[in-house]
Swiss-Prot record:
Belongs to the universal ribosomal protein uL6 family. The keyword NADP does not apply. Part of the 50S ribosomal subunit. It holds the Pfam family Ribosomal_L6. InterPro entries: Ribosomal_uL6-like (IPR000702), Ribosomal_uL6-like_a/b-dom_sf (IPR036789), Ribosomal_uL6_a/b-dom (IPR020040), Ribosomal_uL6_bac-type (IPR019906), Ribosomal_uL6_CS (IPR002358). Keywords: Ribonucleoprotein, Ribosomal protein, RNA-binding, rRNA-binding. PROSITE patterns: RIBOSOMAL_L6_1 (PS00525). The keyword Acyltransferase does not apply. This is Large ribosomal subunit protein uL6. The gene is rplF. One of its GO terms (biological process) is cytoplasmic translation. One of its GO terms (cellular component) is cytosolic large ribosomal subunit.
Amino acid sequence: MSRVAKAPVNIPAGVEVKLNGQLLTVKGKNGELSREIHNAVEVNQDANALTFVPRTGVANADAQAGTARALVNAMVIGVTEGFTKKLQLVGVGYRAQMKGNVVALSLGYSHPIEHTLPAGVTGECPSQTEIVLKSADKQLIGQVAADIRAYRRPEPYKGKGVRYSDEVVRTKEAKKK
């Protein structure tokens, strides 16, 4: 059995968990998240904990149990604390600003880029070179941050581009004559 799946997911006070067949719904102060759990995994709900048991006779049940536990744990953390992703814009003239739920980016192209944030993700720009994204859904916020970063990934010679705030960009040395 997966080591990750052996640990139960603790349900803190103020979080409501509903299990309807294989559909798990987690509700908390930051919203409500739902996820379909793989058929190879059996979910047991106690008073304040969820346990994930792989079904016997299914090939990848152990792996699916560990994955399901990790995803549900992220859901519980998301509805209680939420997730934050910070992006930095490095480069001359690179700017960002929020217009409602649209991030307007100026990244050195001939046109401005407008990225609409999906429902469930909020954004703010504390400065012109910073973007802070917040959401209860870990997968969604990671995808939105990756989409924004993909407009101008950090290049390896000067390090210009959109990067995560904790990302370390390894720069190369320029070609010598």
